[in-house]
Amino acid sequence: MSSRGHSTLPRTLMAPRMISEGDIGGIAQITSSLFLGRGSVASNRHLLQARGITCIVNATIEIPNFNWPQFEYVKVPLADMPHAPIGLYFDTVADKIHSVSRKHGATLVHCAAGVSRSATLCIAYLMKFHNVCLLEAYNWVKARRPVIRPNVGFWRQLIDYERQLFGKSTVKMVQTPYGIVPDVYEKESRHLMPYWGI
């Protein structure tokens, strides 16, 4: 494409049906072959099979894999801490999601709450394989799962990844009375708590 990182979302990305988080216990459909959810979703074999999920990316250190034989498991052993090196896994996880999709499977990426670690990995995947900038990828995932809030350390790594992919960044870290946050959080910063890594 002529302007990498600034294209509009392709029709294939916009096509998936919205799934209510409340109806199915904390899962959201990000693309036709990618789901994002909290850790409890990974224990619901019926739900996983009903959604056509064949691969589970477990982005936690605290939740064990269930190791059911019908699913492929990928472990990303990270704490939800700003210093955790999630960027080391961006390419590996994105490549796996893409590979599963090409085989007509679907991937669930989960962490404990489905808010920070798993959302960060989904955003990185969208940048790499759907050729969208960081801001657009974040807005897309947030529209599907409004509770997402990657911690500030993960934002820094996403910004670096966007620069690596596209040579520029569409999100900046800014100083607020509550600490340094990504500019997409600036309007909400008075509501942020230390839990979010500020």
UniProtKB/Swiss-Prot annotation:
Keyword Hydrolase: yes
Name of this protein: Dual specificity protein phosphatase 14
Reactions that this protein is recorded to catalyse: O-phospho-L-tyrosyl-[protein] + H2O = L-tyrosyl-[protein] + phosphate; O-phospho-L-seryl-[protein] + H2O = L-seryl-[protein] + phosphate; O-phospho-L-threonyl-[protein] + H2O = L-threonyl-[protein] + phosphate
List of catalytic residues: C111 (phosphocysteine intermediate)
Main function: Involved in the inactivation of MAP kinases. Dephosphorylates ERK, JNK and p38 MAP-kinases. Plays a negative role in TCR signaling by dephosphorylating MAP3K7 adapter TAB1 leading to its inactivation.
Protein's organism: Homo sapiens
EC annotation from Swiss-Prot or TrEMBL: 3.1.3.16, 3.1.3.48
Gene3D superfamilies: Protein tyrosine phosphatase superfamily
Quaternary structure, from the entry: Interacts with CD28.
Organism classification: Eukaryota, Metazoa, Chordata, Craniata, Vertebrata
